[in-house]
Regions:
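Terminal connector regions
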Residues: 120-153
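Extracellular beta-helix/beta-solenoid repeat scaffolds
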Residues: 169-208
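Core beta-strand segments of extracellular beta-sandwich domains
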Residues: 52-62
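Surface-exposed binding patches on compact interaction domains or structured appendages
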Residues: 21-42, 62-115, 120
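C-terminal motif of bacterial Sec signal peptides marking the signal peptidase cleavage site
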Residues: 16-19
């Protein structure tokens, strides 16, 4: 019986010690603020319905205590196509494009990854896409990181075979996938002001 009591007491002590350790790891500071490796994250220019390469930035806690955010969210949700991963958590529609209760230990950091999948803008010229990633603290204060990218509407040509005299004309860029092949006795004319961009592996091949 005595041994059983000692065992229970030891279990209680270990549980208490574990809880205290966790509290020490996340000793949340009510007034602490995070620091960022950028104040504006600029992504590449992207054609509509395609994705930019992923870029990232760091979030630092230079405080002597842990810092907790009530939420990290995209200000405009997914209206512009920005896709964000916060320390392994993807801000998708199932989460309302936000994550809650993000904590950064003292003198530690987390990494955030961002890309954008641009939709058609229905405009001739490149259009600026801009949103804010908002960090909200328990005291209601906020910090923002601005996200920027340019979206450019474009037509897509896939593995075009030119079998007769053909003219390509467009006021918006044309992205070529798979290449263009001009057969013998056929003429391909590219109208003045028309711009072609060839995707990786695509080329213009002229037979004969």
């Amino acid at each position: 019986m005595k041994i059983a009591r000692i065992y229970i007491f030891l279990c209680w002590v270990l549980t208490l010690f574990s809880a205290c350790t966790q509290d020490e790891l996340f000793n949340i500071s009510s007034g602490g603020r995070l620091s960022f490796s950028v104040d504006t994250l600029r992504l590449d220019t992207v054609f509509s319905n395609t994705s930019t390469p992923t870029k990232s930035f760091w979030v630092y806690n230079h405080n002597g205590k842990g810092v907790k955010c009530r939420s990290v969210r995209l200000e405009r949700g997914n209206q512009l196509g920005f896709q964000v991963n916060v320390d392994g958590v993807f801000l998708g529609s199932n989460l309302g494009y936000q994550t809650n209760e993000i904590a950064v230990r003292e003198q530690d950091s987390i990494r955030i990854y961002v890309k954008v999948l641009a939709t058609a803008t229905q405009e001739k010229d490149p259009q600026l896409l801009t949103d804010n990633l908002i960090f909200t603290y328990d005291d209601g204060k906020e910090q923002k990181i601005n996200l920027r990218a340019w979206a450019w509407d474009a037509h897509v040509l896939r593995s075009l075979q030119v079998k007769k005299d053909t003219t390509i004309s467009s006021q918006t860029p044309i992205v070529v996938y798979g290449g263009i092949t001009v057969n013998e006795n056929s003429v391909l004319t590219i109208a003045e002001g028309t711009t072609l961009y060839f995707h990786s592996g695509a080329a213009l091949n002229v037979k004969g």
